[in-house]
Amino acid sequence: MTLILGIDPGSRITGYGVVRDTGRGCVYVASGCIRTGSGELHERLQIVYRGVREVIKTYGPVTMGIEKVFMARNADSALKLGQARGAAIVAGAEEALEIAEYTATQVKQAVAGTGGANKEQVMMMVMHLLKLTQKPQIDASDALAIALCHAHTRSSLIPHGLSTARSRGGRLRL
């Protein structure tokens, strides 16, 4: 049974989701949001970094999936998102987690069966797959979806003798 951390990065709100892959599916462990407030960017990045490290220390995942940066209309927003993502990746790398990156389309495809699913459809599938009775916060739901995508990807790679750890720098680029 593998504990998997999913991260939905953001410079103001970073969602996290932890699931246990039992080999027969995933079980919900925890989820939530790291809220950075409205301080200076370097202060917010430090909060993301510390928050992700705290989640790792609390739950003990061995692997992490994180969403790739998409190209936003606003270049400044995309850069800030990339920096928050970097803070989360460094936190995972410092704790020796296996790290894999997924596009939003890959996550939606793995969880909802279509890369064009909307946030509500993804949330409903997350609730169904993890047997949740209450809706998680949207950023936490996205992070749980990333964790589920990572679990699915790992389970399809392992029987073929592949591992997410074999890639350059411990990060699997799909």
Curated annotation (Swiss-Prot):
Amino-acid positions noted as binding Mg(2+) 2 in the UniProt annotation, renumbered to this chain: 67
One of the record's GO cellular component terms: Holliday junction resolvase complex
Pfam families in alphabetical order: RuvC (PF02075)
Reported function: The RuvA-RuvB-RuvC complex processes Holliday junction (HJ) DNA during genetic recombination and DNA repair. Endonuclease that resolves HJ intermediates. Cleaves cruciform DNA by making single-stranded nicks across the HJ at symmetrical positions within the homologous arms, yielding a 5'-phosphate and a 3'-hydroxyl group; requires a central core of homology in the junction. The consensus cleavage sequence is 5'-(A/T)TT(C/G)-3'. Cleavage occurs on the 3'-side of the TT dinucleotide at the point of strand exchange.
Residue positions of the active site: 8, 67, 139
Natural source organism: Pseudomonas savastanoi pv. phaseolicola (strain 1448A / Race 6) (Pseudomonas syringae pv. phaseolicola (strain 1448A / Race 6))
Gene Ontology terms: biological process: DNA recombination; DNA repair
EC assignment: 3.1.21.10
Cofactor note: Binds 2 Mg(2+) ion per subunit.
Protein name listed in UniProt: Crossover junction endodeoxyribonuclease RuvC
Gene that specifies this protein: ruvC
